[in-house]
Amino acid sequence: MKMIYAIVRPEKVYEVNKALADAGYGASTKWSVAGHGKQHGIQVGELVYDEMSKNMLMIVCDDDDKNEIIDIIMDTAQTGESGNSGDGRIFVLPVEESYTISSQSKDD
């Protein structure tokens, strides 16, 4: 199993979730986060915004589904041409074990 963390722009999170659900990947966890990447925030006039609002999605999937999920997120979350700074990041981690609390059982 893999755990995919996707940091996307807030205005893209609904579209990403819908595309994932339409492809059969409806289970995810979402929360609001703030941070900055290479651009270190933005400056508007004299105001400097060090951190930008983003949404983080967490998706646990089978190894075989990882590439399709990543492709869906990248295609849906991109706001313009390739290389547009600030569109987000995707991180993939291995999942060693998973448990369902209600049944107190280890998942396969």
Regions found by a protein language model. Name each.
Residues 1-108:
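Positively charged, small/polar-rich N-terminal and surface patches that mediate targeting and assembly
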